[in-house]
């Protein structure tokens, strides 16, 4: 499948059209960003690692009955995906307290959350992705009640599948974000799942193995991503 025109360039990925109006090419770049895109650096191999990581995770979620946009792996940095009508809201599942939750509530980082929390955020970098709720989504027309219910159901199902996958690999799935869209009217998982959009800690040491290594200037970003990929069985080379 040949990529044609650039459709959209995000902070770490570029989307291209193809000759099929229902399919797009998603290219993972080496860019890494923080502070809503205000800080950006390039890391060798990052695009390749995240692309193969994401393809692996999406396949696992498909096996569990979660519909995804994934079609096929095209190259080290590219995948073929369905063209979705994206819902402009991020779904976040939190198994442990970290990030904005700690700042907002003043609770201890690492606190186990049982049952896991489900949060919604409006996708808007200029507004720093404000937290919203289901009432906002319905009032402003971002998603219907049925779509929200399905997004929540699929997010918790993904959490069940991925928490076990990472736990078996000696890792804690602290939290993660998912984005959904519509394909022929069906709610489908889009965007990506990688250490860019999740928090993963080593079970024994609690070392951070995700983009917090970049956000907090801990170093060893790609080494951590590759270690996580290796532990869960992603073939990188």
UniProtKB/Swiss-Prot annotation:
Keyword set includes Ribonucleoprotein: no
Cellular component aspect of the GO annotation: cytosol
Protein's UniProt keywords contain ATP-binding: yes
Gene3D superfamilies attached to this UniProt entry: ATP-grasp fold, B domain (3.30.470.20), Phosphorylase Kinase, domain 1 (3.30.200.20)
Coiled-coil zones: none
TM segment ranges: none
Pathway annotation from the record: Purine metabolism; IMP biosynthesis via de novo pathway; 5-amino-1-(5-phospho-D-ribosyl)imidazole-4-carboxamide from 5-amino-1-(5-phospho-D-ribosyl)imidazole-4-carboxylate: step 1/2
Sorted UniProt keywords: ATP-binding, Ligase, Nucleotide-binding, Purine biosynthesis
EC id: 6.3.2.6
Biological process terms in GO annotation: 'de novo' IMP biosynthetic process; cobalamin biosynthetic process
Pfam families recorded: SAICAR_synt
Alphabetical list of PROSITE patterns matching this protein: SAICAR_SYNTHETASE_1 (PS01057), SAICAR_SYNTHETASE_2 (PS01058)
EC class (word): ligase
A GO MF term: phosphoribosylaminoimidazolesuccinocarboxamide synthase activity
Catalytic function, reaction form: 5-amino-1-(5-phospho-D-ribosyl)imidazole-4-carboxylate + L-aspartate + ATP = (2S)-2-[5-amino-1-(5-phospho-beta-D-ribosyl)imidazole-4-carboxamido]succinate + ADP + phosphate + 2 H(+)
PANTHER family: MULTIFUNCTIONAL PROTEIN ADE2, SI:DKEY-6E2.2
Annotated family: Belongs to the SAICAR synthetase family.
Entry protein name: Phosphoribosylaminoimidazole-succinocarboxamide synthase
